[in-house]
Amino acid sequence: MCSSDLCRPIGEPMFATAVDQNQLLALDDRPPVEVLNQLYGQASDHDKQLMQHSLFVGLAMRAGESTYGQGDYLIRNVIGADQDSGSIAVAAHLHPNQVVQFPLRDAKTSADDLRQVLGRLESALGSGTPDGALLFSCTGRGRGLYGESGHDSASFTETIGQLPLGGFFCNGEIGPVGGTTFVHGYTSSFAVFRPISSE
């Protein structure tokens, strides 16, 4: 099973130095709203537009890593901000000193990540041909993100080949991050079926 998200990180990873349940109170000892204002000031016009409606919080799910990359973060919604305290409310329970990075929802990044995930899946399959697959794609993808229907299923067929492919659109997809399974949003999750080897 594999998952593809659709976010591109902005800024640098930071530590959540103060949290209260789902409230992000400080990032590297700075108010998160201050950090976001700085990121906004440094952003391109395109990213400034995305930050107004497509900003998320990425939560690193493996502690103690020295570097984090695409697929290492659990992506969660920003559900509010308090201008007075500078805190941000996140749709997740937060942990002290958890690594956090802000990502933006972006169609190009999503398509690129999907190609990379499918490429890794193709390599993992080796010479064995799957019997079929399931695709569970978020309702926030498809035509609304890419401007066309069937993007993810077409990418799957292009990379893995013609095989029975079923599934449906979801509002929450199950897939791995950092070796643990989570319910995601805005992702496509694939499950591939093939015979068990007799060896």
Where are these regions (language model features)?
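Small-residue-enriched flexible segments
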Residues: M1-A133, C138-Y146, G150-L163, F168-E199
